[in-house]
Curated annotation (Swiss-Prot):
EC numbers, comma separated: 1.14.13.81
Cited NCBIfam families: AcsF (TIGR02029), PRK13654.1 (NF010172)
InterPro entries, sorted: AcsF, Ferritin-like_SF, Rr_diiron-bd_dom
Top-level taxonomy: Eukaryota, Rhodophyta, Florideophyceae, Rhodymeniophycidae, Gracilariales
Chief location category: plastid
Compartment(s) where it occurs, according to its Swiss-Prot or TrEMBL record: Plastid, Chloroplast
Pathway(s) it belongs to: Porphyrin-containing compound metabolism; chlorophyll biosynthesis (light-independent)
Name of the protein this chain belongs to: Magnesium-protoporphyrin IX monomethyl ester [oxidative] cyclase
Amino acid sequence: MSTSQNLSQTPVKETLLTPRFYTTDFDEMSKLDISSNIDEFEALLQEFRADYNRQHFIRDQEFEQSWNNLDSGTKALFVEFLERSCTAEFSGFLLYKELSRKLDKSNPVIAECFLLMSRDEARHAGFLNKAMSDFNLSLDLGFLTKSRKYTFFAPKFIFYATYLSEKIGYWRYITIYRHLEKHPEHRIYPIFKFFENWCQDENRHGDFFAALLKSQPQLLNNLEARLWCRFFLLSVFATMYLNDFQRSNFYKSIGLDARQYDMQVIRKTNESASRIFPVALNVDQPKFFQYLDQCAVENKKLIEIDQKYNNWFIKKLIKMPIYIKLCSCLIKLYLLPAIPSAHVVSTIR
């Protein structure tokens, strides 16, 4: 009889690129005035109540088999994908659940939206964790709740970052799904069949945060807002690009080129964001992906140094010029002229 290894009680080194757990200023959130956009929130609430994916996340017979046919390298990459995805979904669940509890009295419409989004995130995390059990692994989500460090983000930063996180999640899932529909020989595990409906949850969550941003015009209609939008667009895109550069072999195992995949996802997310953000990044400027490639190369050097050296001081010394190059590339990316998107009509699809 096989035993299940508990991954969440194994210490994990946190970096800027690892999935994080967030908290925010709940008092400030409770004072949000959403009256200018209440009709959209009411419509979104009806969408969440409908729970279109209630019967979607049910494992079928295709899961009931041995996965020993996967080579050890592919299996390790896939399990890491499941673990990171589960951690990210569970992080969303915790944040949304706490927001629903804190806002229940002051803003019941928003509170119920957060509650129903937390339902979706918990469902996703549970489904991913169950998939991990097929490989005799699991995440102790209760232990994870207590043991992980929480990063504080002001509400407006939560809005920007989570809007983009949900929208980029949509484009990641639907891009993989469409690719594997055309090339089923690369579908190494049945969870990918669920991505079409799954990504619609991400899309609806993104629409909710778009509605929050529109209800707070000061977050979209001035110079400060434009600068923050550029910052979060670049942060989310660069984080994904650097992460996926490290894991190109995973994408290769499902028949995708990681760089081409990321370029497609970035372009689509940038286009989606232009419907709500006042600016979009000029991702068609050749230097944009050239600088991202340079960032990915420098980031890989940092990882290799961690693997090669044990002495903390030596590692810091060797890393310093690499950090400077990496920061220089990121600054160059940020300073590339953005594209105004105020003329694009904001719509919720």
